[in-house]
Amino acid sequence: MKKPTGLNLKNKTVVIGCGQLGATIANKFSKEGKNLLIVDESEKSFEQLSEDFSGYTIVGECTDLEVLESAYIKSCKELVIVTGDDSINVLVATIAKKIYNVPNVYVRLSDPDNEILLKGLGVKVIFPLELSFDKFNLMRGAK
């Protein structure tokens, strides 16, 4: 596994999963000038990144410690885990907190029942359906 070179390790954000949500987050963070690295098991997924994406990409299985270490997870400021699989997301969040002490971990979950698996870890959970509903309510002026 080859680590990216020339990466500024200070204030780095790592995104795990380059599906629709991960690519959107990575593209927006890149546009904001964030120091960014994104990991996905499929190189084809990176085609969703914009042409002006300024971060780094790593192809690999995110549950593999060697892949996580090649993404400099030990020194990242924040980790955003947004694969389409709750089980993988919970596992990577647990690894990030318990093994690497990542200070800010954000995890996408589809099933609210899985949130209990992260209880006590200090992980912030993202529920896309709830966010969509909240935005919908704001649009229609509901309180």
Regions found by a protein language model. Name each.
Residues 1-143:
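Cytosolic regulatory regions of ion transport systems
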